[in-house]
């Protein structure tokens, strides 16, 4: 099962095999105010599957030059750290911020690094982390910009000590946001957590054998909360 800020006031079930907890609040740059309680609940998972009993997920975004965005980088440095950026140098032109692959990478890095360092996660290396990629969060029409930001998120998570990182999405949303991922990208070959929508456990198990998002393997399939579990999504292990 997976929970986040929408379940703050909801009763959480017992004896789930494993649980995935959302680190962010309503927006990617906000905290999940119930993180401590939900992590404690997840830690009591019964186990019995190949999945780690407690996992985490964080939200992807790429607002670009949207004036409503609270932050957009103007250099390759974030909080005193200058990560290796294969897209080049993020900077300004005529004193104005620029939407470039390099700046998208640094923005993604800022999200990932903050998720690990300021959201309240102790021992980040102890968990498997997932990046939640959905259309209802900010993203660019150019998939190359979103891929750069996703690579930055992975770099930021790793800089904070995370070791295992997978991708959560649906095939259609992933295609719209990330497009085609080349083998030269650190996105390629990562474990997938696929959202199936309203469905059944039988169909979820069948979806374990469907085409992965970016050359990886499908580790889990999510069934929408509307199927038999109130406000909490159910997840089926594929391993």
Specify the residue positions occupied by each region the protein language model found.
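Functionally critical loop-and-helix segments that line ligand-binding/catalytic clefts
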Residues: 1-13, 184-239
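Substrate-binding cleft of extracellular glycoside hydrolase catalytic domains
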Residues: 1-149, 159-160
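Aromatic-lined carbohydrate-recognition surfaces of secreted/lumenal glycan-active proteins
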Residues: 56-57, 157-179, 190-199
